[in-house]
C-alpha cells in the first residue's frame, strides 16, 4: 500500500492542484451504502482472512466475485497461473466500447488480504467498489472498452514479485499489445474521519501539512510523473461529479511506497496508472491487523466516493 513521498522536493514540485471542469451530461448515480456493506461483510466477515496460506478462503473470495459478475450479466475470464503446487487466478470482465474498442480503461482491486487480517478495508472495500462500478457499467456502453479486474496475491509474500497477480496481468497485457489508456487501482477506500489530527504523515510531517489537510476526510489519487495527464483528467472528472473531498499527488517512482499496490505493476510496463485510496496506514489504525473488520468501514462515505468514481469512469471511457 501507500506511503507518502519522503522527498520534500518531490512534494513541492509535483503536488497537483486542480479545479473542477465541466463535463458532458452524466446522470448522477447513488450507490446504496448497504450494497457496499454486503460485499464487505461477505468477503471480510464471512470468508475472512484470504490468502495463499488460507487457500480455501481465497478461492471462496474468487467464487464470490465471479458469481456477482455473472449475476450482472458478464462473461468472466479467469487468468490462471501456477504458484508452487497451486493455481491462482485474476478475474476479468469486459464492457466493450463502441467507437474505440481497442482503447482500454482498466479498473482493478486485489481480493486477497494480508496474513492475519480479515481485510475489510484492505481490500474488501476496493472489491466492493469494483463490483458496484461494474454493475453500473453493464447498463452504459461507452466509446472505449472498460475492463474490470480482480487481482489475486497483492499482499506479502507475493507483493512486488513475479507472482503478484497484477504483475502477471500487466506483463501479459504488454506482450499482447493491449492499449490500456488508464489503469485505476482501488485500494483501501473505506475509512474517513472529521477529527483534527486524524490524518498523519511521514517525516517530515510539518511540510506535508502545508499542502494537505490534517483531517482524514478525503480520498487521495496517486500517480507517477508519467501519469500526470491521467491524474489531472481523473481528478477533474471526479470533482465535476462529486463534492466528496479529493486530494492528489504526482511524484517520482523512486519515492518509497508510491507504487505499493497493483498500479505499480502497470507503471513497470509503461502504462498510465493511478491509485485511489484513503491513505491506509496514514489514517487507518487497524491497517494490516486482525481488527480490520467490516464495522470499521464508513459505508456512507465509501458510497459517496464510488458515486464520484462512477462519473469519473464514464468521463474517462467516452
Predicted regions and their residues:
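Active-site-adjacent substrate-binding region
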Residues: 182, 189, 193-318
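Extracytoplasmic/secreted proteins, especially bacterial periplasmic and envelope-associated proteins
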Residues: 35-38, 42, 56, 60-71, ...
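Acidic/histidine-rich catalytic neighborhood of metal-dependent amide-processing enzymes
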Residues: 114-232, 258
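A non-catalytic alpha/beta surface segment that caps or lines the substrate-entry region
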Residues: 38-98, 247-249
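Proline/glycine-enriched tight loop/beta-turn segments at coil->beta junctions
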Residues: 98-104
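Active-site-proximal beta-strand/loop segments in catalytic clefts of secreted hydrolases
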Residues: 43, 79-81, 95-97, 108-112, ...
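N-terminal capping segment at the start of a domain
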Residues: 14-60, 72, 112, 282-292
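Second-shell loop/turn segments in exported
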Residues: 24-31, 45-56, 77-82, 113-123, ...
Amino acid at each position: 500500500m501507500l506511503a507518502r513521498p519522503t522527498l520534500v522536493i518531490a512534494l513541492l514540485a509535483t503536488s497537483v492542484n486542480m479545479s473542477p471542469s465541466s463535463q458532458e451530461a452524466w446522470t448522477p448515480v447513488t450507490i446504496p451504502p448497504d450494497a457496499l456493506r454486503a460485499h464487505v461483510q461477505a468477503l471480510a466477515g464471512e470468508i475472512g482472512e484470504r490468502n495463499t496460506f488460507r487457500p480455501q478462503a481465497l478461492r471462496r473470495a474468487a467464487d464470490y466475485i465471479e458469481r456477482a459478475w455473472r449475476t450482472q450479466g458478464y462473461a468472466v475470464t479467469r487468468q490462471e497461473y501456477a504458484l508452487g503446487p497451486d493455481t491462482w487466478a485474476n478475474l476479468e470482465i469486459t464492457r466493450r466500447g463502441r467507437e474505440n474498442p481497442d482503447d482500454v480503461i482498466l479498473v482493478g482491486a486485489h481480493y486477497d488480504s494480508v496474513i492475519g487480517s480479515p481485510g475489510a478495508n484492505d481490500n474488501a472495500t476496493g472489491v466492493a467498489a469494483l463490483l458496484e462500478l461494474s454493475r453500473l457499467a453493464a447498463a452504459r456502453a461507452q466509446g472505449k472498452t472498460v475492463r474490470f479486474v480482480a487481482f489475486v496475491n497483492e499482499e506479502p509474500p507475493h507483493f512486488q514479485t513475479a507472482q503478484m497477480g497484477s504483475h502477471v496481468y500487466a506483463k501479459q497485457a504488454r506482450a499482447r499489445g493491449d492499449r490500456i489508456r488508464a489503469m485505476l487501482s482501488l485500494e483501501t477506500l473505506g475509512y474517513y474521519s472529521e477529527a483534527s489530527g486524524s490524518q498523519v504523515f511521514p517525516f517530515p510531517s510539518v511540510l506535508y501539512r502545508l499542502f494537505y489537510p490534517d483531517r482524514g476526510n478525503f480520498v487521495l489519487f496517486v500517480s507517477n510523473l508519467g501519469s500526470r495527464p491521467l491524474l489531472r483528467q481523473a481528478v477533474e472528472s471526479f470533482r465535476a461529479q462529486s463534492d466528496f473531498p479529493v486530494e492528489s499527488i504526482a511524484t517520482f517512482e523512486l519515492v518509497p511506497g508510491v507504487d505499493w499496490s497493483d498500479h505499480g505493476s502497470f507503471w513497470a510496463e509503461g502504462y498510465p496508472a493511478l491509485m485511489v485510496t484513503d491513505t491506509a496506514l496514514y489514517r487507518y489504525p487497524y491497517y494490516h491487523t486482525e481488527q480490520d473488520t467490516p464495522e470499521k468501514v464508513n459505508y456512507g462515505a465509501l458510497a459517496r466516493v464510488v458515486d464520484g468514481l462512477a462519473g469519473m469512469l464514464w468521463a474517462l471511457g467516452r
